[in-house]
């Protein structure tokens, strides 16, 4: 089960094989926001408090496209014996 704070790897899409940490989860839609993955550009209007422009931020990705990475299980590569 994918939870906030865990490391995951992307299985499909333009960010395939990239790894990152889960920032946010959207349970009703089965989507997760991963740090540094699925970056999109948003156009922001100028307001009294904030300056407008183009802002890059992470977008949600479906959890079926993510694979949980187990840091404890990572070991050295093993050789097959003949």
Curated annotation (Swiss-Prot):
Gene: rplX
Organism listed in the record: Pelagibacter ubique (strain HTCC1062)
Protein name: Large ribosomal subunit protein uL24
Regions that span the bilayer: none
InterPro entries with a match to the protein in the record: Rib_uL2_dom2, Ribosomal_uL24, Ribosomal_uL24_KOW, Translation_prot_SH3-like_sf
Entry-linked Pfam families: ribosomal_L24
CDD domains membership: KOW_RPL26
Assembly behavior: Part of the 50S ribosomal subunit.
GO MF entry, a single one: rRNA binding
UniProt record, GO biological process: translation
This protein's GO CC annotations: ribonucleoprotein complex; ribosome
Gene3D superfamilies linked to this entry: 2.30.30.30
UniProt keywords, alphabetically: Ribonucleoprotein, Ribosomal protein, RNA-binding, rRNA-binding
């Amino acid at each position: 089960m994918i939870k906030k704070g865990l490391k995951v790897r992307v299985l499909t899409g333009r960010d395939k094989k990239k790894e990152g940490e889960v920032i946010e989860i959207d349970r009703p839609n089965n989507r997760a926001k991963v740090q540094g993955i699925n970056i999109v550009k948003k156009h922001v209007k100028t307001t009294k408090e904030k300056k407008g422009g183009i802002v890059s931020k992470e977008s949600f990705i479906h959890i079926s496209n993510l694979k949980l990475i187990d840091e404890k299980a990572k070991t050295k590569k093993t050789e097959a014996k003949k």
